[in-house]
């Protein structure tokens, strides 16, 4: 692509400038390109000269002029290069190259924008991993949208991606034990027993529903059991019930996992014990106050962390370290975890444990996403009594649908809090961003259907025979420019962990297309121009379909 040619040419220009004495021999700078907000500033721009000026001193514009003297670019790709402002170098693609993009899209179809940056290396992406103590919450739905989109982005950049959901089902889980105790209390209450739920139990009415379902299927037989036996039965029942619910929620949201990994397997296979032994052998543990501790401060954490409690039960960190050891031992080249906002404090200690086991920390990344707040217009939606202190994802999907939910979850960077407007998400109007993008795809489908009704063969059978030089209107060239950005958008969104770039890009494509549609009649009396514009319209549809598929949103042909 032209951007790659420019980056290569700028890199060589720096090297040539150093050889010619125009730059000091030791200076280095990574070449980065940006898309200017104002199209008058070219198609891409670089601040390379400003970066170099900060290292060597002197005016950035002079350094930019020196770089241009050593810059060699193919004329068929770049039409104009100029220095602007404080020292930016702006590049304008040639119309000839832009038109060639349409041929490339027609040739590659749904593979357009894909690259082999990952080289077939393996990546394990773990996300959602909600505790099995209640329904999947809206905030975890955001994790699902982020994780699934990142998985597709990495797959499109040449990675062999596996998706995994981690289930905290170990018998020593305090949270599941507390849930079993809450379920027991709700079960006994149905028989008139004066039993209070635990002080730190689960308040949602969904626990009452589960108790009633249990009575419908099993009756009162648990009343006769000893409490220990009853709690064990409720532990197992609730775990299966809730995990099955999580699986249904993910299926309804269009998110499919390659593996549902259960924490209990780590204990069954003695992997937690093996990880603890490896930490001991490596000298990263010590005993104090009857507990086993990880020397986390030696590995970048603010304080040492408990691995095994005083009562001999392994803490959550021991299992987390064993789980990530398991991931590495499965042979993955790279690991990415996506965690919720309440797990920020766990990042350093988990990475410390992984590093203590001797694994390369650069192969392991933990991403934190922020909270979601639901609004109806200007009014924030409060938590429901039925769900306790959470808003279930299933309720959101019933309200606005999976398409709107996924699109809206991806409209902000994961580091930002997300305000989700429920009324806007359901609105059948162009100020609803998901409707706006889907409508662009549907409008294109309508154009293509009308063309077929007129006897035009579609898809255009031989794009090489189409005279694309007829595409000269500013709106035509603007649309091609926007379509040409897809490969870089996909690569940047993956490399920078920014799936929200895809919803922004989708809206930009839709906006430029709508402008083109308003000002350029596609089906006219000029057969040659019609063929060229149909080729452009088909390319726009391909790009929109790719982007919508990547973010998990449907691409309707009629609306």
Q: For each predicted feature, which ranges?
A:
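Non-catalytic interaction-recognition regions
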Residues: 1-99, 106, 110, 114-559
């Amino acid at each position: 692509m032209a951007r790659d040619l420019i980056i290569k040419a700028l890199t060589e220009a720096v090297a040539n400038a150093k050889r010619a004495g125009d730059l000091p021999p030791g200076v280095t700078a990574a070449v980065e390109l940006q898309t200017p907000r104002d199209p008058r500033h070219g198609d891409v721009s670089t601040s390379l000269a400003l970066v170099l000026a900060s290292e060597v001193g002197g005016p950035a514009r002079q350094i930019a002029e020196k770089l241009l003297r050593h810059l060699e670019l193919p004329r068929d790709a770049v039409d104009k290069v100029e220095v602007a402002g404080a020292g930016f170098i702006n590049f304008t693609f040639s119309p000839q190259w832009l038109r060639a993009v349409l041929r490339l899209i027609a040739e590659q179809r749904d593979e357009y924008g894909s690259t082999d940056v990952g080289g077939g290396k393996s990546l394990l992406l773990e996300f959602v991993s909600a505790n099995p103590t209640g329904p999947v919450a809206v905030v975890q739905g955001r994790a699902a949208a982020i994780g699934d989109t990142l998985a597709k982005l990495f797959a499109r950049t040449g990675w062999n991606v596996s998706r995994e959901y981690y289930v905290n089902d170990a018998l020593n889980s305090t949270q599941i034990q507390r849930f079993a105790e809450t379920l027991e209390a709700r079960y006994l209450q149905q028989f008139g027993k004066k039993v209070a739920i635990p002080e730190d139990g689960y308040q949602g009415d969904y626990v009452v529903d589960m108790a009633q379902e249990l009575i419908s299927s099993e009756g009162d037989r648990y009343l006769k059991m000893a409490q220990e036996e009853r709690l064990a039965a409720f532990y197992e029942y609730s775990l299966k019930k809730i995990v099955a619910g999580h699986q249904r929620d993910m299926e309804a949201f269009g998110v499919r996992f390659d593996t549902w990994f259960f924490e209990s397997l780590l204990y069954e296979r003695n992997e937690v014990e093996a990880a603890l032994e490896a930490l001991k052998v490596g000298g990263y543990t010590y005993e104090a106050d009857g507990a086993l501790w990880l020397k986390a401060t030696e590995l970048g954490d603010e304080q040492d962390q408990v691995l095994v409690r005083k009562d001999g039960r392994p803490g959550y960190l021991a299992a987390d370290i064993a789980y990530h050891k398991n991931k590495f031992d499965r042979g993955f080249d790279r690991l990415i975890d996506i965690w919720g906002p309440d797990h920020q404090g766990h990042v350093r200690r988990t990475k410390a444990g992984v590093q203590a086991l001797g694994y390369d920390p650069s192969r392991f990344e933990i991403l934190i996403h922020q909270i979601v707040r639901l609004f109806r217009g200007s009014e924030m939606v409060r938590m429901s009594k039925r769900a306790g202190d959470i808003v279930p994802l299933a309720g959101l999907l019933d309200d606005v649908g999976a398409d709107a939910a996924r699109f809206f979850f991806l409209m902000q960077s994961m580091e930002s809090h997300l305000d989700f407007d429920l009324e806007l998400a359901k609105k059948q109007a162009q100020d609803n961003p998901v409707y706006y993008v889907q409508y662009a795809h549907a409008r294109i489908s309508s154009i293509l259907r009308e063309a077929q009704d007129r006897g035009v063969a579609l898809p255009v059978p031989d794009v090489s025979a189409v005279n694309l030089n007829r595409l000269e209107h500013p709106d035509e060239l603007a649309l091609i420019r926007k379509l040409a950005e897809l490969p870089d958008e996909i690569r940047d969104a993956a490399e920078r962990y920014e799936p929200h770039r895809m919803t922004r890009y989708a809206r930009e494509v839709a906006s430029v297309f709508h402008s083109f549609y308003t000002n350029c009649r596609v089906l006219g009396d000029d057969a040659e121009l019609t063929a060229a514009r149909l080729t452009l319209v088909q390319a726009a549809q391909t790009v929109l379909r790719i982007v919508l598929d990547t973010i998990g949103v449907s691409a309707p042909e009629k609306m």
